[in-house]
């Protein structure tokens, strides 16, 4: 904001500025009046600047100057005033008049400078009159093309099938028994697991049908083959029995199970000894099984493979299916009533149950025929609106709802050529009937039956053609008008004969079909649009040709220039047009005159302004007349009667010049003149918006199910197996002996080093005693141990009886007991003599004894007794020490003394009992 002092100064200067402006305007008005006065007297002066400004000479053809109403424009800013050649002043009134004219000329020169073109590209052209050396004619009208229309379009309903990559799923039942053998070692204060053996054995067929399915029970023993040996395992090392199956603790969405025991049998051993225990757990488990084409095997949710077709059976067709096992491992049970092991109820309807034994388990499943259980193709899309178009030897099925186009041959593809495809006709017919009843029942009629086409990418298109009711009635009326039988509705070629059977191989992506749809959509739209444009363009050109022929008679130059494409001059020579080439003139070499009046003819004026130009910068100045569109005519014969109120705009360079009353007024820019368009708008329909939505051939779940193994389910089942069939919370406590020993150890440990030493000795003895007693009691508590002890006792009693009998015989008759053979011989001789009645030889009938031999026998017996006594004494001396040796020495001395003192005797004397004791 300006300060107050500045405002006061501006208020004082403003009246002075207004006064100066008014004086300048008055002076200009006086000068203009003088100039008009000179022009009224018929003076036509020619003004020329210095030689270096000769190109800016102004030729005023005696026309009147602009009046005050128009007012010549002032000097254009940025253009310097050109110096004028000073004239010799005249004295008096004449001198003042010349001064006024000089000012008027200066203003006119400034105005003319403003008229000059500012754009260097706005060229002027000089077109000489054609001589007829070159003539042209217009072309005759052309025939216009027709817009191509589609042919043989058919509407209908379609059902699209794809390859079935999902496996065949069914429920299978696993029967097996888990055998666990544990070995433990019992310490003084702890129990250590030293061995663990796990195995699985299949359940026999008879036990499945007669025990598990009939009673809901399972036996606790199992006999199976391992390493070519038949072995038997008993649960808890007890005789086998039937145990109830109980539901598992947890389950998965695809499986459930039952078991007989959840506790591991690990018996306590005696301190310092090993003990083994066996656990047999009968498990029945329902799992999901999967089999993929060609259905030669299936895999269980546990990860186990079974190499037999799920459709294998004993029937004629089922027996041809694949089976990798021997015949004795497979059994098919007709009339099998499955039992629900949870509720115990039996199914009301019988099934055919397949049973197969593997080395680890027995698998059972319900047999079903292969057809219609599986189908090699599956329904993908139901299309309510499907357009079929014929393109040469192919059909294109287009669906706007799918934004896809499927290309097929014109010949049909019978579904019988696809293996396991009986479901196609059944599912397609049901889908078509449902769509027709819901949407087309009142408006359309079916044409023939279902048609089958194999599309690119491995898709089977089942198509039902339709026609509207009105079109069907038209066909009937046409047939009646011709008095003919009703013509059959349009049909397609019959399907080819069925060849070798195979399966479809469908691509995972349908992008090619969507691209085909996009291309066909764009092609159809663009071709129709271009066809309409071409036809309309041709018709427009033929219609405009008439206008061109008429317009060339009025302005041949403009018509010829527009037709040839460059500036030419032209004139009509009868029915042809002569042309000549125009010469370009630079804008700075063209000068416009300020008046359009003829000095010699006051009532006649020029119809267009006069100009002066040069072909080159230093060339000679040539007079001409401004034509249309910056054309310079060499003749100045375009005249017209002068009229009052004359106003004209003429193209000059890149703008317009405005003449009023046949005198230059001012310059007008092209932008200041409103434009009226002569173009005809072409109304074209642009492409409609199409959103590409994701279209999946196979969903993520289908791709996941395409594999036989569901690894997530396998891992889930394996990790939950222990939770389902084992008790991991129950703990078996140690024996009381271990608790007693642990308490004693803690007691002695609290007494210090001495107590620990004493405790070790006491604990060792106590543990030994407890172990012996526990071993004996455990051995006796065992049935086998008790039987063995009984047998040992019986054997001991028998041995004692025979020993006692022998001792009694030895005491009664030692010689007979010690020498039974000798006594047997004497008794035999005596019996023989008694039987014969002959007396024995010798006096008195008794055989005489040899006294010498008897004495030798007595001596031998005596010394044998002495030797035995001496051996006993020596043996006792080794144990008793010195006293025993002294006693033995004294005994020897006594014996020797007795032997030397006793005289030899021939009679037999037995050794007395006291003597034998003394020797000992």
UniProtKB/Swiss-Prot annotation:
Disulphide linkage map: 127-582, 144-538, 218-282, 375-423, 605-642
* Gene Ontology annotations of biological process type: symbiont entry into host cell; virion attachment to host cell
Principal subcellular localisation of the protein = virion
The compartments listed are: Virion membrane; Host cell membrane; Host endosome membrane; Host Golgi apparatus membrane
Q: What does this protein do?
A: Envelope glycoprotein that forms spikes at the surface of virion envelope. Essential for the initial attachment to heparan sulfate moieties of the host cell surface proteoglycans. Involved in fusion of viral and cellular membranes leading to virus entry into the host cell. Following initial binding to its host receptors, membrane fusion is mediated by the fusion machinery composed at least of gB and the heterodimer gH/gL. May be involved in the fusion between the virion envelope and the outer nuclear membrane during virion egress.
This protein's assembly is summarised as: Homotrimer; disulfide-linked. Binds to heparan sulfate proteoglycans. Interacts with gH/gL heterodimer.
Q: In its UniProt entry, what is this protein called? A: Envelope glycoprotein B
Native organism is: Saimiriine herpesvirus 1 (strain MV-5-4-PSL) (SaHV-1)
Query: What gene does this protein come from?
Result: gB
């Amino acid at each position: 904001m300006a300060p107050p002092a500045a405002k006061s100064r501006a208020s004082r200067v403003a009246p002075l500025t207004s006064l100066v402006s008014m004086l300048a305007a008055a002076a200009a008005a006086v000068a203009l009046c003088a100039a008009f006065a000179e022009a009224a007297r018929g003076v036509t002066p020619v003004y020329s600047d210095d030689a270096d400004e000769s190109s800016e000479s102004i030729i005023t053809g005696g026309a009147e100057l602009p009046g005050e109403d128009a007012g010549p424009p002032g000097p254009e800013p940025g253009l310097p005033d050109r110096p004028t050649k000073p004239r010799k002043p005249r004295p008096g009134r004449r001198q003042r008049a010349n001064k006024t004219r000089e000012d008027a000329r200066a203003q006119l020169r400034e105005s003319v400078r403003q008229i000059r073109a500012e754009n260097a590209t706005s060229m002027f052209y000089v077109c000489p009159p054609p001589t007829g050396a070159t003539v042209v004619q217009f072309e005759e009208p052309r025939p216009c093309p027709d817009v191509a229309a589609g042919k043989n379009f058919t509407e209908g309903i379609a059902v699209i099938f794809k390859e079935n990559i999902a496996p065949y799923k069914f429920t299978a039942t696993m029967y097996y028994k888990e055998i666990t053998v544990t070995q433990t070692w019992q310490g003084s204060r702890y129990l250590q697991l030293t061995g663990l053996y796990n195995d699985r054995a299949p359940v026999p067929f008879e036990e499945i049908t007669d025990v598990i399915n009939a009673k809901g029970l399972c036996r606790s023993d199992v006999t199976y083959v391992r390493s070519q040996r038949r072995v038997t395992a008993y649960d808890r090392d007890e005789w086998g029995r039937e145990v109830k199956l109980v539901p598992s603790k947890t389950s998965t969405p695809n499986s459930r199970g039952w078991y007989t025991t959840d506790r591991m049998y690990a018996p306590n051993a005696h301190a310092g000894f090993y003990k083994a225990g066996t656990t047999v757990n009968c498990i029945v488990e329902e799992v999901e099984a999967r089999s993929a084409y060609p259905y030669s095997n299936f895999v269980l949710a546990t990860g186990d493979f079974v190499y037999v077709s799920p459709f294998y059976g004993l029937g004629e067709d089922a027996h041809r299916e694949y089976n990798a096992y021997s015949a004795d491992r497979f059994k098919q049970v007709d009339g099998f009533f499955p039992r629900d092991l949870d509720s115990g109820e039996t199914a009301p309807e019988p099934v055919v149950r397949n049973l197969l034994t593997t080395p680890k388990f027995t698998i059972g499943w319900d047999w079903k025929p292969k057809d219609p259980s599986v189908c090699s193709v599956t329904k993908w899309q139901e299309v309510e609106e499907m357009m079929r178009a014929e393109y040469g030897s192919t059909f294109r099925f287009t669906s706007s709802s799918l934004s896809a186009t499927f290309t097929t041959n014109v010949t049909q593809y019978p579904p019988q050529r696809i293996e396991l495809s009986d479901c196609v006709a059944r599912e397609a017919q049901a889908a078509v009937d449902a769509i027709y009843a819901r949407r087309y029942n009142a408006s359309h009629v079916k044409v023939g039956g279902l048609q089958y086409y194999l599309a690119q990418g491995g898709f089977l298109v089942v198509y039902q053609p339709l026609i509207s009711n009105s079109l069907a009635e038209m066909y009937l009326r046409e047939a009646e008008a011709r008095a003919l039988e009703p013509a059959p509705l349009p049909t397609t070629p019959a399907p080819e004969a069925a060849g070798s059977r195979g399966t479809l191989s469908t691509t995972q992506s349908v992008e090619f079909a969507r691209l085909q749809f996009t291309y066909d959509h764009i092609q159809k739209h663009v071709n129709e649009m271009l066809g309409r444009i071409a036809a309309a363009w041709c018709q427009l050109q033929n219609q405009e040709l008439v206008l061109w022929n008429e317009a060339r008679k009025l302005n041949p130059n403009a018509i010829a220039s527009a037709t040839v494409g460059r500036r030419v001059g032209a004139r009509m020579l009868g029915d042809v047009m002569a042309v000549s080439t125009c010469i370009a003139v630079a804008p700075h070499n063209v000068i416009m005159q300020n008046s359009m009046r003829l000095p010699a003819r006051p009532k006649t004026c020029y119809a267009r302004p006069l100009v002066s130009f040069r072909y080159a910068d230093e060339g000679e100045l040539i007079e001409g007349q401004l034509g249309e569109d910056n054309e310079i005519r060499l003749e100045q014969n375009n005249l017209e009667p002068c009229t009052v109120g004359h106003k004209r705009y003429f193209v000059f360079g890149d703008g317009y010049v405005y003449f009023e009353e046949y005198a230059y007024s001012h310059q007008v820019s092209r932008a200041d003149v409103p434009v009226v368009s002569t173009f005809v708008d072409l109304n074209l329909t642009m492409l409609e918006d199409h959103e590409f939505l994701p279209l999946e051939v196979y969903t993520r779940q289908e791709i996941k199910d395409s594999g036989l193994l569901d690894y997530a389910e396998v891992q889930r089942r394996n990790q939950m197996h222990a939770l389902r069939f084992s008790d991991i919370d129950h703990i078996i406590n140690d024996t009381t002996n271990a608790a007693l020993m642990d308490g004693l150890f803690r007691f002695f440990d609290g007494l210090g080093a001495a107590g620990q030493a004493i405790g070790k000795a006491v604990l060792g003895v106590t543990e030994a005693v407890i172990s012996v007693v526990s071993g004996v009691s455990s051995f006796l508590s065992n049935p086998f141990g008790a039987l063995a002890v009984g047998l040992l006792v019986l054997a001991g009693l028998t041995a004692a009886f025979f020993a006692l009998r022998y001792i009694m015989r030895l005491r009664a008759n030692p010689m007979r007991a010690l020498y039974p053979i000798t006594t047997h011989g004497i008794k035999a001789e005596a019996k023989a003599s008694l039987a014969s009645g002959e007396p024995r030889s010798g006096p008195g009938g008794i055989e005489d004894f040899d006294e010498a031999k008897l004495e030798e026998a007595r001596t031998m017996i005596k010394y044998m007794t002495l030797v035995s006594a001496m051996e006993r004494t020596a043996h006792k001396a080794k144990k008793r020490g010195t006293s025993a040796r002294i006693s033995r020495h004294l005994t020897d001395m006594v014996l020797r003394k007795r032997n030397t003192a006793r005289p030899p005797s021939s009679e037999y004397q037995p050794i007395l009992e006291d003597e034998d004791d003394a020797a000992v």
